[in-house]
Design a protein with these regions (language model features):
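C-terminal output helix
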Residues: 15, 149-158
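Charged docking surfaces used in two-component/phosphorelay signaling
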Residues: 58-66
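Short hydrophobic/Thr-rich beta-strand motif most characteristic of the beta2 strand and flanking loop
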Residues: 68-75, 83, 145
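Active-site beta3 strand of CheY-like receiver
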Residues: 87-93
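Receiver (REC) domain active-site loop signature in two-component systems and cognate sites
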Residues: 98
């Protein structure tokens, strides 16, 4: 499934074709994108998804829940900080452009906390510029995922951080 994000506009799905293509691979037996071992290794992981878009939060929650992850969501950086303290996630996805406390500030606060500094943070953004990626690294993020992202990209990003 792909999600297109346009700054200041609504999100739109292009999921039917991707879903049909993936289903065809599984039925024909031509390379299920996520191996059984990868799915098992994701089972039980606590993941926090921080994004001001309800569509992105729901989509990530649905995809990750199907893989056995325990998913928590937050609408902005302030909400995320309280959820991090309450749930102690194994991995955090943070959107860059959010109201009140943006993704860079949120990541920086997480990485400056003695308890949570080792928690992997993956930045999410519809912007794919070198400056944005560099700024994410400066504040401590481990990886940068550009929207729209596929299920494979989302799960691959998690696998890169937990393995």
């Amino acid at each position: 499934m792909r999600i297109w994000a346009y700054p200041g506009k609504n999100y739109r799905y292009s999921g039917v074709l991707e879903w049909a293509r993936e289903l065809g691979r599984v039925l024909i037996g031509r390379g299920n994108p996520v191996s059984d071992n990868a799915s098992r290794s994701l089972s039980g992981l606590k993941i926090l998804v921080v994004d001001d878009s309800k569509t992105i939060r729901r989509t990530a929650e649905t995809l990750l829940s199907k893989e056995g992850c325990q998913v928590f969501t937050a609408i902005d950086g302030f909400d995320a900080l309280s959820k991090i303290a309450d749930h102690q996630p194994d991995l955090i996805f943070v959107d860059i452009m959010m109201p009140r406390l943006d993704g860079y500030q949120t990541c920086s606060l997480i990485k400056h906390n003695k308890v949570f500094r080792e928690t992997p943070v993956i930045m999410l953004s519809s912007k794919d510029g070198l400056f944005d990626r560099a700024r994410g690294r400066i504040v401590g993020s481990e990886q940068y995922l550009t929207k729209p992202f596929t299920k494979d990209e989302l799960l691959g990003a998690i696998s890169n951080q937990i393995n």
